[in-house]
Amino acid sequence: MMARGYWLINSNRTEVRRFTENRASEDQFNKYVFVDSGKIVGVFGKEAPLLQRREEFKLDDARKIWEKLISQGWRRTEEVWSK
């Protein structure tokens, strides 16, 4: 089962980010989060964004990225990639 994702979209509605916990990590001392980046293609909501990259960060670093994006005008949004 995939971890619940948390989503952000930029103010131009051209890019999205999905933050999900990496439940498969074997590190017993740190939690890790995947940050998936995608580009909106076509009409938003009609087609899934094009996945451009996946990066993995420690939880604290992922929180800093989230906060930085929010400060730059990104907003929470609903899921845009299917399960």
Q: Can you say where each PLM-predicted feature lies in the sequence?
A:
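Terminus-proximal functional modules
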Residues: M1-K83
